[in-house]
Amino acid sequence: MIYLKINKPIKKGTLIGLDLASKSGYAIIKSSNKKVSLVSYGSININRHSNELLRLHNTATLLVRTINPFIISKNTLITIENCYLGKWNPRTYGFLSRLSGYIIPSIINAYRGILTINNFKLLYPSTSKKLVGLKGNANKQDSVNYVNNIINNKRLEFKLIHNNICDAVILALAGGFDKEVKKC
């Protein structure tokens, strides 16, 4: 368990951030009584050259298995990075939108009776960055630096290669902050 230095009020419960992509990052944060801790994080790398439906299914299956031990109550919020055009690659945009559309029902179905659509938030990358105090156009290195600054553990330091995990941490935190940011 890694304690995080957070200066804003945050929702109590389990906060899960999912940065969906060909290499999806996830972060699971527990918050209670002013203690906020990163309890699990990682990335799931799916073969880009396999059939797209198989990639969608495998990503959903692996994410459901990964978050399974942490979904124990209805007090869970899953924040997913919303699709955005980025450098405008239509194939990438199409895959990301289908992945989001596949993941949410897969998770709800796996945790029927615990989770509903109300346990999910979709945030654009710029919005999630603004919610944690970064600029909306912050680059990958800025995100990594932010996460390294809030980690209260000198033995753990994320590198640029871990940007998908850091984005997932930012998404989980942004979802848990009560204050919303104006539209980007």
What are these regions (language model features)?
Residues 1-184:
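Phosphate- and other anionic-substrate recognition elements at nucleic-acid/protein interfaces
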